């Protein structure tokens, strides 16, 4: 009975993790992320600029959401890593707590790709050149 109590207590503790993104290309990329915050609201944030062959932690601490959304733009070579999850962005550094019609709010409608971190205690998204696997298509 004690073992069952300990196990359920351990499972109830929130996992501390960081969301990291690695740019494995040789080009500079701009990155934006989206997620549901602890209150259930939609948050999008950007822009991080990552030089080629570097990694950066985009979110520190307990991940408030199982599903994360990533959009990246190749500043040097053109192209993007995008998907079918449309979220709001703007052209300068931002944190938006919004949803709904991006255009009506004066924002850009941007297609992000979805990342399911499941119950991971640490997660890294890797941006790769076409044909190398990794996060989204360029």
Question: Where are the predicted features?
Answer:
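Bacterial N-terminal signal peptides that target proteins for export
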Residues: 1-2
């Amino acid at each position: 009975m004690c073992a069952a109590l300990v196990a359920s207590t351990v499972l109830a503790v929130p996992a501390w993790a960081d969301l990291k993104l690695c740019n494995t290309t040789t080009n500079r990329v701009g990155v934006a992320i989206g997620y549901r915050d602890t209150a259930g609201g939609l948050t999008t944030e950007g822009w991080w600029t990552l030089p080629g062959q570097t990694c950066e932690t985009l979110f520190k601490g307990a991940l408030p959401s199982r599903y994360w959304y990533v959009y990246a733009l190749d500043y040097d070579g053109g192209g993007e890593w995008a998907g079918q999850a449309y979220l709001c962005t703007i052209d300068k550094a931002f944190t938006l707590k919004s949803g709904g019609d991006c255009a009506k709010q004066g924002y850009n409608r941007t297609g992000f790709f979805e990342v399911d971190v499941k119950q991971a205690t640490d997660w890294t998204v890797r941006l790769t050149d076409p044909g190398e696997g990794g996060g989204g298509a360029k």
